[in-house]
A protein has these predicted regions:
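N-terminal secretory signal peptides
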Residues: 1-3
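Long, histidine/aromatic-enriched segments associated with O2/redox biology
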Residues: 7-468
Length: 468
């Protein structure tokens, strides 16, 4: 039975802004929180974006990371008469939450990310002096380029994609929905320093322990067209696994300082990173009705890939990836590119590198650290400006795409590669959103914004303590 958004929320007895709505079904359908190791310390280090205690499993012979079950992103503008007072109050609220929950999936992950508008409006002089600099982008353009720049529309983005201007985005992750609800209450109901602009909710994992799998069950419950076609046990609405361990950047690789791509004046932002946030709808029905399994595999990975029927988890290690020459040769031969293959031309290390802390990163190592999650928001769970954001009543399959890269430009290089615009300057002759372009034929990006994630020590109103 197809349920409207209103009916789903009415069935929970709570409102959109205060409750989780349809996402309360996650715990019922998943059968509780995933098994996690109980022998863990607090899990919090210098970085905000890293989460300790993530479960590792083997699926189809491939190591896979199982992310926290529940996710929420809240965007907001700053409402503060005194930044000094606001900083103290926010830090006290965060300390309260961290004393209550460890920084693990079983506890609570909290990541504060700050947008360009915050730095321009509240700390412009301090930002001009101390914002991290993207050395690679600066060298290419011949001018100084900040590691954080405004988001742009890409070739395959619709003209109506909204480039957002939020001051802050707060990412909350936990296996326990109650922990996220508690953090939401503390940070946005009790604390008076933010005005919410949107709430974005969703889930991850839930497809590796047998049975139908969480994405399929949730999509069916929401009445998503084509939901019954989602393969049982899938991690994502589109059927394939995306959290292969070797497909995600390891530990500190996305930190500003790790690869030498970005420098941080006076070291203020060392231990920080860049975060891109976007919402993308997925046409599940078109994906399964118009693409046979073989074409789905070639679209998701690369043309010519040989997978057994029904395979969902595909190796993505350094030996299984594609470079620019591979992608160009394949395109010349087949007229198409695969999603993963195209991305890998920019998202993987072209040579072995030694990090600032001595860590050796082999050639082919992934750089981006993704934290995206499935959603039925359309496009958000709640918006302060529903008309502008295009809020719709019916749930829609999609993803809130959250990814950590060393800089805005590093993210953009990878996203352009998805459109056939490779890092070496090659632009493949692909019609935007065509089937030749991989997933783009069935994806539509509604919103985008870039953010800077400070290290934990500077997470509360960064640079504001330097104002005089």
């Amino acid at each position: 039975m197809k349920l409207s958004r209103r009916r789903l929320l009415a069935g929970t007895g709570i409102g959109v802004a205060a409750g989780a709505g349809i996402y309360e079904l996650v715990d019922q359908l998943a059968g509780g929180s995933p098994a996690r190791s109980a022998d863990l310390a607090d899990g919090r280090g210098v970085e905000q974006h890293l989460l300790a205690g993530v479960r590792e499993i083997v699926d189809d012979g491939v190591e896979v990371l199982v992310p926290p079950l529940h996710h929420e992103v809240v965007t907001a503008t700053v409402q503060a008469g005194s930044l000094a007072t606001a900083r103290r109050e926010l830090e006290a609220a965060l300390a309260q939450l961290e004393a209550r929950y460890p920084g693990t999936p079983a506890g609570l992950g909290i990541t504060l990310a700050w947008g360009v508008p915050y730095f321009r409006r509240y700390v412009p002089r301090q930002a001009a002096r101390l914002m991290p600099i993207d050395q690679r982008a600066s060298q290419v353009t011949g001018r100084t380029v900040s590691a954080l720049t405004d988001a742009v529309r890409f070739t395959s983005d619709p003209e109506e994609t909204i480039l957002e201007q939020n001051d802050v985005a707060i990412l909350l992750r936990s296996d326990a929905l109650a922990h996220i609800a508690d953090a939401h209450r503390v940070l946005f109901a009790e604390l008076g320093v933010f005005v919410k602009t949107s709430v974005r909710r969703g889930f991850a994992g839930g497809g590796f322990d047998g049975g139908i799998g969480l994405p399929k069950q949730m999509a069916v419950a929401a009445g998503v067209k084509g939901a019954d076609l989602i393969p049982d046990g899938s991690e994502l609405f589109l059927g394939f696994t995306s959290t292969q361990k070797t497909g995600l950047g390891p530990a500190r690789i996305a930190n500003f300082e790790s690869l030498g791509l970005v420098t941080s004046p006076d070291g203020y932002f060392e231990g920080g990173t860049h975060m891109h946030l976007s919402h993308i709808t997925e046409d599940v029905e078109a994906w399964y009705l118009n693409f046979a399994f073989r074409e789905r595999a070639e679209t998701a990975f690369r043309p010519g890939i040989d997978l057994k029927a029904g395979a969902r988890t595909v190796p993505q290690g350094p030996d299984e990836i594609s470079n620019a020459a591979d992608v160009k040769e394949t395109f010349a031969r087949t007229g198409s590119i695969g999603h993963s293959a195209a991305l890998q031309t920019a998202s993987r290390l072209a040579v072995e590198l030694i990090g600032d802390d001595g860590t050796v990163y082999p050639k082919g190592t992934a750089i981006p650290q993704r934290a995206d999650f499935n959603t039925l928001d359309n496009p958000f769970a709640w918006s302060a400006r529903p008309g502008v954001d295009g809020m719709a009543k019916e749930p829609a399959a999609g993803v809130h795409f959250v990814v950590f890269n060393p800089s805005s430009d590093d993210f953009a290089r990878t996203r352009r590669a998805m459109d056939g615009e490779l890092p070496d300057g090659t632009k493949l002759a692909i019609t935007p959103r065509s089937r030749m372009q991989g997933f783009n034929a069935i994806l539509r990006t509604t919103h985008r914004q870039n953010f800077l994630v400070p290290p934990r020590r500077a997470r509360a109103f960064p640079l504001s303590e330097l104002k005089r």
